[in-house]
């Protein structure tokens, strides 16, 4: 396709931290370009999932193509690709950005720059995108436009002199944003090959059409009837339909170079069209794939078990359906003595895990128990093999283990200067090692290397509480480091409960064992016999607490009486309790499994 026909196309996305008004700005742009009539407008048009609306976050990438007549009289075609804003979905963000030539950096004029938008902005600059700063929420009394501009320049390092000040809520200055998109973001450039190359930005499952993929055509064109090949898997598919979203789905006769739209090619599940992969023509393939594709690796694992064992087949079916839409979700069957049959699931992070569990419970009416989330450790065995371990109860016997390695992440925290001390204390508590502190304008950037296991559970919540909600966090995986790790097992009346095993640093083992026993003592109801709760490392018991038995007062009917008579009755009761203990089973309530999560609180 010639550069003339691409001259009036503008592909852009919006980079913003959660809650800075990205979806509202998108709504206004759609309204101004006439994508939807006023009566069809609803808040957050592009957040199609009810959980996205409720939590006010964007999870999946969406796109919309809008015609816009600029003030110079020309009609431009704006392709807006929506990106998720949360750190769990950073790979999806990088793929959305790779499909664009420019990005709007939306910053809340009242709050200033936050870490997540910094990370995504760096990704955009690395990929050579033109970044246009937009200051949102200027209608708020606390908005400080000059401070926000200074922060963008100091923290991100891009010129904010021409930043567009808008209020997405009231619609103020939205036309200036559209003019900035048209005049400051460059049109798509022709590539070095004329063979078809299309980047898959996202894929989702449609009950009637099968898998629908959102693609950006880099070169060549896609028409219904052409045979395409997915470059990472080598599979070929026949294209049924192509089109764009306006935000409604609209069919076209072809998608040309520079355009963003959807294709439907009878692919059965989303693993057949992985995000970030390249599509090309099967008969005349491109010489190489587009750069940047990687398999999504789950970083956090947890067991999901149905409360009612009869729901197991329904849980499997629900997970299968969710996986059609969520390429990052992994699961395999797992059985646990304490919990019965369920699944071991892998997620990108804690938010991803919460969303999956919420969707299973809400959309499929399942009642679920989840075990404490763990990260993936690497275990070097004595025979030299390295195995990934996502479940503490699957740790090989200690005489076969040479060393255990934990994942380390690099965390960048942005905070106002007042909270630096609190945040450093928190990071040190979490076994972090400091990399550097930079003072950037009115913000401070603190960099730490932290064990991922410490970050996964509650680091985000604690960071928000020590900084009164002002600090923001972005992190990425670095490497695996060896350390003195042990598995703490929980025994109840001498039986090991596999779902309560945790892997901890040796220096924390005693404290965690003690806390776990105390917590379990509160949560396990009293039985007719004593319940011994023990925490053990290997064969060594490190802590114990006992839930005392409920007992009947057998001496009530002896008034004065002889002491030997009383002793006889007490001995008889003791015998009965002993027998009961041998045959009795302790039911462990759901709260006890979640106790592992709350121990640090």
Curated annotation (Swiss-Prot):
GO cellular component, as recorded: plasma membrane
Cited HAMAP family: LepA (MF_00071)
Protein name (database record): Elongation factor 4
Reaction catalysed by this enzyme: GTP + H2O = GDP + phosphate + H(+)
GO BP terms: positive regulation of translation
Binding site for GTP: 19-24, 136-139
Bridged cysteine pairs (disulfide): none
GO molecular function, one term: guanosine tetraphosphate binding
Domain of life: Bacteria
Domain tr-type G as annotated: residue spans: 7-189
Function, as annotated: Required for accurate and efficient protein synthesis under certain stress conditions. May act as a fidelity factor of the translation reaction, by catalyzing a one-codon backward translocation of tRNAs on improperly translocated ribosomes. Back-translocation proceeds from a post-translocation (POST) complex to a pre-translocation (PRE) complex, thus giving elongation factor G a second chance to translocate the tRNAs correctly. Binds to ribosomes in a GTP-dependent manner.
Location in the cell: Cell inner membrane
Annotated membrane topology: Peripheral membrane protein
Organism: Xanthomonas campestris pv. campestris (strain B100)
E.C. code: 3.6.5.n1
Similarity comment: Belongs to the TRAFAC class translation factor GTPase superfamily. Classic translation factor GTPase family. LepA subfamily.
Coarse class of the protein's main subcellular location: membrane
Keyword field: Cell inner membrane, Cell membrane, GTP-binding, Hydrolase, Membrane, Nucleotide-binding, Protein biosynthesis
SUPFAM superfamilies: EF-G C-terminal domain-like, P-loop containing nucleoside triphosphate hydrolases
């Amino acid at each position: 396709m010639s550069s003339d026909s691409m001259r009036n196309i503008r592909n852009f996305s919006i980079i913003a931290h959660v809650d800075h008004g990205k979806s509202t700005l998108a709504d206004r742009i759609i309204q101004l370009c006439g994508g939807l009539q006023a009566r069809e407008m609803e808040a957050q048009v592009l957040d199609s999932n009810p959980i996205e609306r409720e939590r006010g976050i964007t999870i999946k990438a969406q796109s919309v193509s809008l015609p816009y007549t600029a003030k110079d009289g020309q009609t431009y075609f704006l392709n807006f690709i929506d990106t998720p804003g949360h750190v769990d979905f950073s790979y999806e963000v990088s793929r959305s950005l790779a499909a664009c030539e420019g990005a709007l950096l939306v910053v809340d004029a009242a709050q200033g720059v936050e870490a997540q938008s910094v990370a995504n902005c760096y990704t955009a600059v690395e990929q050579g995108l033109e970044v246009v700063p937009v200051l949102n929420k200027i209608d708020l009394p606390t908005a400080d436009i000059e401070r926000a501009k200074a922060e963008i320049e100091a923290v991100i390092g891009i010129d904010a002199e021409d930043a567009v000040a808008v209020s997405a809520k009231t619609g103020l200055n939205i036309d200036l944003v559209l003019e900035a998109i048209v005049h400051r973001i460059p049109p798509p450039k022709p590539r070095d090959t004329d063979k078809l190359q299309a980047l898959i930005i996202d894929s989702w499952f449609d009950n009637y059409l099968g898998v629908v993929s959102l693609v950006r055509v880099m070169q060549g064109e896609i028409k219904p009837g052409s045979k395409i090949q997915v470059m990472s898997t080598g599979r070929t598919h026949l294209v049924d339909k192509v089109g764009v979203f306006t935000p409604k789905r609209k069919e076209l006769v072809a998608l040309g170079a520079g355009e963003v739209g959807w294709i439907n090619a009878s692919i059965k599940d989303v693993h057949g069209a992985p995000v970030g992969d390249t599509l090309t023509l099967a008969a005349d393939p491109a010489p190489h794939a587009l750069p940047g594709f990687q398999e999504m690796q789950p970083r956090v694992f947890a067991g999901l078990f149905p409360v009612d064992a009869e729901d197991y087949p329904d849980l499997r079916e629900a997970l299968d359906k969710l996986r059609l839409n969520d390429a990052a979700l992994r699961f395999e069957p797992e059985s646990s003595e304490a919990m019965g049959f369920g699944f071991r699931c892998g997620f990108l992070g804690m938010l991803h895990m919460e969303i999956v569990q919420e969707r299973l419970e809400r959309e499929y009416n399942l009642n679920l128990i989840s075990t404490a989330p763990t990260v993936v450790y690497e275990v070097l065995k004595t025979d030299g093999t390295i195995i990934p371990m996502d479940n503490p109860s699957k740790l090989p016997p200690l005489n076969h283990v040479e060393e255990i390695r934990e994942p380390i992440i690099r965390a960048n925290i942005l905070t106002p200067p007042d909270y630096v001390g609190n945040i450093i204390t928190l990071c040190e508590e979490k076994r972090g090692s400091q990399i550097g502190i930079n003072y950037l304008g009115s913000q401070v950037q603190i960099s730490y290397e932290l064990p991922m296991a410490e970050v996964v559970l509650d680091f985000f919540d604690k960071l928000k509480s020590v900084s009164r909600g002002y600090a923001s966090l972005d992190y990425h995986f670095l490497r695996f480091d060896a350390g003195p790790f042990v598995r703490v097992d929980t025994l109840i009346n001498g039986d090991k409960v596999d779902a309560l095993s945790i892997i901890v640093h040796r220096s924390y083992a005693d404290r965690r064992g003690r806390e776990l026993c105390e917590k379990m003592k509160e949560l396990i109801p009293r039985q007719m016999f004593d319940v011994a709760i023990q925490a053990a490392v290997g064969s060594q018991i490190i802590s114990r607490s006992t839930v005392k038995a409920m007992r009947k007062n057998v001496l009530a009917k002896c008034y004065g009486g002889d002491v030997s008579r009383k002793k006889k009755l007490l001995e008889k009761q003791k015998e009965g309790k002993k027998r009961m203990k041998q045959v009795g089973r302790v039911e462990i309530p759901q709260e006890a499994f979640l106790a592992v999560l709350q121990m640090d609180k």
